[in-house]
Design a protein with these regions (language model features):
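Juxtadomain coupling helices with adjacent low-complexity linkers
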Residues: 55, 59-64, 97-101, 148-175
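Structured interaction and signal-relay segments at domain junctions
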Residues: 62-124
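Intrinsically disordered, low-complexity terminal regulatory regions
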Residues: 7-83
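Short hydrophobic/glycine-rich mini-motifs in sensory/regulatory modules
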Residues: 135-145
Length: 175
């Protein structure tokens, strides 16, 4: 943890204003949930992702699907890729998603792209076949699950599996 040199007062409602520059650098959006940690004299804030609790099961799900279909499969929260299985894991895993993917997730519908260039993470685009379903819990978008391949098309069977997994993860977040 590093110090920023910024000092803020707490108002009478217990609020602290986080400077715009820090919010911009950490990609914290208005209304985004923050987790509070307390340790002796320290209070720390962390961006909250309800999918963090499901990282282990997410990794197992993407691994199983990827092994079966021989394609890249990944799960995102609203900020980064939290589970990846297939080729190029070192390039994509635990990286922030691009604004393009963020906007597509927020459209709250299936995205099916055939042989087009897409930007998965900032500064890294790829020509591929790509299918994405949003993960929706309690009416809010929490992330997405995607399958992609540079060479093979996405089949109807694969589409149905990805859709079911998106619904399953949404139900898990609700509980």
């Amino acid at each position: 943890m590093k110090t920023t040199g910024v000092v803020r007062r707490i108002d009478d409602l217990g609020r602290i204003v986080i400077p715009k520059e820090i919010r911009r650098n950490m990609k914290i959006k208005d209304g985004e949930s923050m987790e509070i940690f307390v340790d002796n004299d320290y209070i720390a804030l962390k961006k909250y992702s309800c999918l963090d609790d499901l990282v282990n099961i997410s990794k197992e799900l993407v691994e199983s699907i990827s092994n079966e279909f021989k394609k890249n499969v990944f799960i995102t929260d609203m900020n980064k890729i939290i589970a990846w299985s297939g080729n190029d894991r070192k390039i994509y895993y635990d990286k922030n998603i691009s604004s393009y993917i963020y906007n597509k997730i927020n459209e709250r519908k299936m995205i099916n792209i055939v042989d087009e260039r897409i930007e998965l993470i900032d500064g890294k685009d790829i020509v591929c076949n790509f299918l994405m379903f949003p993960i929706i819990a309690n009416g809010d978008v929490k992330g997405s699950i995607s399958i992609m391949s540079e060479y093979d098309s996405i089949t109807t069977n694969e589409e149905q599996i990805i859709k079911v997994i998106a619904q399953f993860l949404g139900k898990q977040v609700e509980e």
